[in-house]
């Protein structure tokens, strides 16, 4: 310690020499220890930087890595050993079940092959069906059938004809003929054509087949108008006879149904009521007079099949009871199938004159009677009336109407008494006395069958909602009968006939205030008077005169009132 320090510190106690020596010795030891430390540090640094130290470090690291690798190897060996054991077990299992797997593989292979073959067969059949479906319209067109009506033609039956008009626009179905159903159909092909004209039924079938070639439309060109001739009359008679004789056989068929069931259907059907004004009546009459008679009517409001079928049968029966038949001409016509009338499809379109829209059976019978009387002059003068056939047909038809309760006894007597009186006036014919007595007893004084005036007039139906429509029906039938007289003549005579029809329509319009029974009586009487005076439709020179009856007796003055 310096002298200044000591002076500043102040006075201190004096140090003994022994103490100073101890202190000097300690200082020297400290200096030596520090020097040694520094030397050791230098040596350490030299050792760390030496290669021996570095190699030793690497050795230690490699030794640790080797230990780790050995440990991993041991674990891998254990894992591989486990996998080997599992593989051995799986191999043993596969060897044990190889036979079962082979059997399953074979079975699955057969199932796959069968499934593929089945699919191929379905595809082949589908291709064949598509080919057949494509060929069917072509075959139908080659056969003269329209593609749109091919299906309907396979479901319907031959078209019945009445009074020279096509009763339905449906097509023909080819069915297996019944051996005992129509015995007269075999001899119908062997009859000689005494008229000198082709049969009307064959012509009608040919025209019906031509309809599809013209696009399926139900009309006939102007040049193919048909005249109402003896062949059409005998065709309707023969059709009714065949249907009457084969009613029992047709009732046994599953698809034909019985006549009683069809009558029940007729009773259950409700007719559509229409309110027709007088202007519409006159316009319809003029339109009918201007249009030619067509084979198939245009699309009109249709009626049900059973109702149309029954009306057609009754009209044919009235036809057979009021006109004569000729054996040679009957055999020259081939009737349709015995069940064709009963199998007529529902909803077929029918002319208004024969199956009215309101479904009045009595009105159809009266109209059919008037139309049949128009054809009576066409019968040959030397032809003899078959009284037995007419009487049997009339009796069967009367029993049919009474059985099915379509007309009451009074209405039936009123409708049929004019036919009975006409049979009395015809040469070589007699009215059935028994039938007349029965009708007279049941009807009483309501309808007289001995009056000359009643034989040419029909009783009036009570006024109801169908009064105007029935008057329209009679007017249409009257104009239709007049048109049938001039169809076969030249154009000038047809024009004159149309003018006469128009004049009659105007006359009916002017006389609209007349009562309904008087108008109906005048229309029907005018038609019957033509048949009564024996005017012929075949004569072209008397075509115009036939439209107006000639006055030959005071009784005929009542006929002229209709034209005034």
Curated annotation (Swiss-Prot):
Keyword hit for Cytoplasm: yes
Which parts of this chain are annotated as the region Disordered? 1-21, 178-201, 304-345, 442-465, 487-519, 531-564
- Protein origin, superkingdom: Eukaryota
Its subcellular locations are: Cytoplasm, Cytoskeleton, Microtubule organizing center, Centrosome; Cytoplasm, Cytoskeleton, Cilium basal body
Basic and acidic residues: bias regions: 493-519
Entry keyword set:
Cell projection, Coiled coil, Cytoplasm, Cytoskeleton
Q: What residue ranges carry the coiled-coil annotation?
A: 28-50
Which family does the similarity line name?
Belongs to the kizuna family.
Q: What is known about what this protein does?
A: Centrosomal protein required for establishing a robust mitotic centrosome architecture that can endure the forces that converge on the centrosomes during spindle formation. Required for stabilizing the expanded pericentriolar material around the centriole.
Q: By what name is this protein known?
A: Centrosomal protein kizuna
- Which species does the entry assign this protein to? Gallus gallus (Chicken)
The organism's lineage is: Eukaryota, Metazoa, Chordata, Craniata, Vertebrata
């Amino acid at each position: 310690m310096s002298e200044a320090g000591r002076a500043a510190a102040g006075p201190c106690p004096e140090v003994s020499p022994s103490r100073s020596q101890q202190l000097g010795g300690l200082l020297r030891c400290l200096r030596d220890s520090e020097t040694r430390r520094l030397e050791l540090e230098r040596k350490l640094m030299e050792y760390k930087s030496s290669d021996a130290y570095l190699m030793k470090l690497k050795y230690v690291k490699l030794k640790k890595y080797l230990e780790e690798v050995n440990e991993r190897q041991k674990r891998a060996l254990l894992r591989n050993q486990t996998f080997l054991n599992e593989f051995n077990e799986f191999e043993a299992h596969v060897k044990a079940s190889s036979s079962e797997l082979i059997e399953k593989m074979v079975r699955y292979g057969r199932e796959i092959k069968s499934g593929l073959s089945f699919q191929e067969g379905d595809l082949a059949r589908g291709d064949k069906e598509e080919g057949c479906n494509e060929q069917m319209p072509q075959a139908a067109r080659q056969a003269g059938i329209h593609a749109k009506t091919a299906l309907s033609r396979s479901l319907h039956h031959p078209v019945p004809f009445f009074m020279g008009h096509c009763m339905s626009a449906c097509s023909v179905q080819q069915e297996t003929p019944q051996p005992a159903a129509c015995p007269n159909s075999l001899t119908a092909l062997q009859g000689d054509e005494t008229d000198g004209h082709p049969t009307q039924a064959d012509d009608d079938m040919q025209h019906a087949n031509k309809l599809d070639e013209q696009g399926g439309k139900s009309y006939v060109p102007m040049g193919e108008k048909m005249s109402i001739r003896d062949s059409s009359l005998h065709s309707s008679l023969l059709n009714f006879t065949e249907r009457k004789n084969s009613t029992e056989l047709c009732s046994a068929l599953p698809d034909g149904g019985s006549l009683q069931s069809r009558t029940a259907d007729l009773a259950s059907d409700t007719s559509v009521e229409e309110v027709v004004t007088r202007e519409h009546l006159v316009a319809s009459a003029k339109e009918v007079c201007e249009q030619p008679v067509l084979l198939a009517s245009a699309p009109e409001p249709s009626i049900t099949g059973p109702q149309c079928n029954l009306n057609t049968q009754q009209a044919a029966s009235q036809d057979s009871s009021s006109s004569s038949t000729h054996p040679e001409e009957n055999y020259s016509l081939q009737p349709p199938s015995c069940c064709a009338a009963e199998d007529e499809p529902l909803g077929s379109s029918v002319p208004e004159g024969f199956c009215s829209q309101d479904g009045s059976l009595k009105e159809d019978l009266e109209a059919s009677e008037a139309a049949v009387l128009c054809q009576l002059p066409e019968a040959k003068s030397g032809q003899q009336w078959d009284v037995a056939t007419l009487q049997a047909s009339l009796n069967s038809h009367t029993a049919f109407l009474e059985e099915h309760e379509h007309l009451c006894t009074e209405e039936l007597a009123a409708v049929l008494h004019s036919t009975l009186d006409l049979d009395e006036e015809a040469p070589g014919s007699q009215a059935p006395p028994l039938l007349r007595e029965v009708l007279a007893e049941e009807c009483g004084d309501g309808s007289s069958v001995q009056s000359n005036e009643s034989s040419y007039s029909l009783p009036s139906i009570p006024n109801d909602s169908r009064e105007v429509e029935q008057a329209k029906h009679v007017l249409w039938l009257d104009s239709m009968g007049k048109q049938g007289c001039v169809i076969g003549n030249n154009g000038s005579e047809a024009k004159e006939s149309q003018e006469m029809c128009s004049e009659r329509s105007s006359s009916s319009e002017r006389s609209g205030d007349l009562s309904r029974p008087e108008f109906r009586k005048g229309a029907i009487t005018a038609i019957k008077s033509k048949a009564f005076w024996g005017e012929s439709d075949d004569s072209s020179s008397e075509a115009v005169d036939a439209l107006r009856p000639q006055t030959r007796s005071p009784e005929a003055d009542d006929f002229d009132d209709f034209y005034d």
